[in-house]
Design a protein with these regions (language model features):
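Conserved redox-cofactor binding core of oxidoreductases
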Residues: 12-20, 139-262, 482, 487
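A conserved FAD-binding loop/helix module that cradles the flavin
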Residues: 519-538
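FAD cofactor-binding and catalytic pocket of flavoenzymes
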Residues: 104-110, 147-151, 320-440, 494, ...
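Redox-cofactor-proximal catalytic regions of oxidoreductases
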Residues: 87-174, 363-364, 422
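Extreme N-terminal leader/targeting segments of oxidoreductases
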Residues: 2-43, 61-62, 542-549
Length: 549
């Protein structure tokens, strides 16, 4: 079987042609299988984002009866997404959450999605792999945590998903050097600035990798470089589970139950096994029976659900006998530095992360910090650009001048690997949401290593922009990309799930989202979350074939 035939066999969704004249296959949604609550299905998945959708697709293809419940809507790109920053806030999880700590993390568009497709609906499309060193930071660098899985064990799933999305980019020289199935996209003005400045400083930079079609891919068109990747990608050139793995799962018999808020996981007090999930849909409380449960609500909602599922058998919260649920939550430091140029740059005219470098990713004994950071182009649209400028104290006439000058600015962003710490965690607050459930409280504080990384990344970005010819630079401090909160570990005293994402406490409960990642890395986490879920699905299907309950 050739490579293309193999991809076709694994994920036919890329070749499903629209059958009603729209980019969304409405027939698949209309005619999808629907289970009754009283049906004891094989698996119910909570959340249908990066991890939940891959698990759904893999297991449905293996013949399992699976339903995924998502708290948000089933998006239709034709009607729900617009080329408008202000008109896209409905894509984000904006329910109440509390933040605390010495360096609190604002919640919203940069780290929370709501709806089928999850946060990948509004991510920038950047899909790098983690490095081999990310899996052994405790052993090699003396910080962070070692994963109970290795990079070689995850590599086959990276390769599968890079074909399925697909990913476009130049050959990647860092970490485990590798190529990508699609050629890199043309470089826009922002990327040209980065490449020019990096070359003058002797810093290697490359184009990609992005999960954005470069050329037609099935029923998905070529990217038109419109700049609205973070608003859903109305043309469907950018891959997300909504247009890749979810349609394929529906075509093979899955059910996706949108606008279904799961409130609690039920556990048999006698056997200690999960029996299904309580959820609310259309204002009614319901219960879906299942032989197995997988949680994929991401790093805030997954710990919150586990803690809200306390019972007499698990009084401190489900899977929380050793006080691990909610701990070791991580973000990446994500400062952004912009530079002004006499010539027009028009940074929005390309995929936002078009050029990047991982030259500073690994620990360097000559630096005063452990681990590292990556740098990539970012392309704030006008409203976000106004926020950048206002953060510098500019207002009124000065702000208007910066806005008029928008097309002359280039912007770079760093992703700094902040370290996992047990005190950075999700707990339950006294406040309740509209369902009567305690809301999540996320407490976060940086350590000295985190701050040193951020300073170093800012300096490198400023140097690159000055080397490229910028006559002014400005920097804002940000966070990006939640992971952790239900991490995988070698034993239950140090984590919530094992190397296969199976919980230590409840034998038929899995967690398959970013909350299981033990470390953050300096790479965007979407592809790694999908790869971890694909590996868990492989384990489940192999175990079922071998008679393992």
């Amino acid at each position: 079987m050739g490579l293309r035939d193999g991809v076709r066999a694994r994920n036919e969704s890329a070749w499903l042609l629209p059958n009603d004249g729209t980019r969304t296959n409405h027939r698949l949604r209309r005619d999808m299988r629907r289970f009754a609550d009283e049906d004891e299905i094989d698996l119910v998945i909570v959340g249908c984002g990066a991890g939940g959708s891959v698990l759904l697709q893999r297991l449905t293809r293996a013949g399992w009866r699976v339903a995924a419940l998502d708290a948000g809507p089933f998006w239709d790109p034709d009607t729900d997404w617009v080329s408008d920053e202000a008109g896209s806030h409905h894509l984000y999880w904006t329910d109440p959450r509390l933040i605390a700590g010495s360096d609190p993390v604002p919640m919203g568009s940069n780290n929370s999605g709501r709806g089928v497709g999850g946060s990948m609906v509004h991510y920038a499309g950047y899909t790098p792999r983690f490095h081999p060193s990310d899996f052994t930071t405790r052993t090699v660098d003396g910080v962070g945590a070692d994963w109970p899985v290795s990079y070689p064990q995850l590599r086959p799933y990276y390769e599968q998903l890079e074909q399925e999305l697909p990913v476009a980019g130049e050959r990647w020289p860092w970490g485990d050097p590798h190529g990508y199935p699609h050629r890199p996209h043309p470089v826009g003005g922002n990327g040209e600035v980065f490449l020019r400045g990096a070359a003058k400083l002797g810093i290697t930079a490359k184009v990609g990798p992005v999960a954005i079609a470069n050329g037609r891919f099935g029923n998905r068109p070529h990217c038109i470089y419109r700049g609205f990747c973070l608003q859903g990608c109305k043309v469907n050139a950018k891959a997300s589970p909504l247009i890749t793995h979810v349609p394929d799962a529906l075509a093979h018999g899955a059910e996706v139950r949108a606008d279904a808020m799961v409130t609690r996981i039920a556990v048999d007090e006698r056997t200690g096994r999960a029996t299904g999930v309580h959820y609310v849909a259309n204002g009614r409380e319901r219960f879906q029976r299942a032989q197995m449960v997988a949680v994929a609500g991401y790093s805030i909602e997954t710990p919150r659900l586990l803690l809200n599922s306390a019972s007499s058998r698990f009084p401190g919260g489900l899977c929380n006998d050793f006080d691990q649920v909610g701990r070791y939550l991580m973000v990446q430091g994500a400062p952004q530095t912009a530079g002004r140029f006499d010539a027009e740059v028009r940074m929005y005219k390309a995929p936002p992360p078009e050029v990047s470098t991982e030259a500073f990713y690994e620990t360097d004994p000559g630096r005063d910090y452990k681990r590292g950071f990556s740098i990539q182009t970012v392309s704030p649209l006008p409203i976000t650009w106004a926020e950048h400028v206002a953060a510098q104290g500019h207002w009124g006439p000065a702000l208007r001048e910066y806005m008029r000058d928008y097309v002359h600015w280039s912007c770079l962003g760093a992703l700094c690997e902040f370290l996992p710490r047990p005190e950075n965690r999700v707990t339950l607050a006294d406040e309740k949401d509209s369902y009567g459930l305690p809301v999540a409280c996320f407490s976060y504080s940086q350590c000295d290593n985190d701050r040193a990384l951020t300073r170093a990344a800012q300096t490198v970005m400023e140097d690159i922009l000055h080397a490229a010819g910028a006559d002014e630079v400005i920097t804002i401090q940000r966070y990006a990309h939640l992971v952790g909160g239900a991490r995988m570990a070698a034993d239950e005293r140090h984590g919530v799930v094992d190397r296969h994402c199976r919980s230590f406490a409840v034998p038929n409960l899995y967690v398959t989202d970013g909350s299981v990642l033990p470390t953050q890395g300096s790479a965007n986490p979407a592809l790694t979350i999908m790869a971890v879920a694909a590996r868990a699905a492989h384990y489940l299907t192999a175990g079922a074939a071998g008679g393992i309950s």
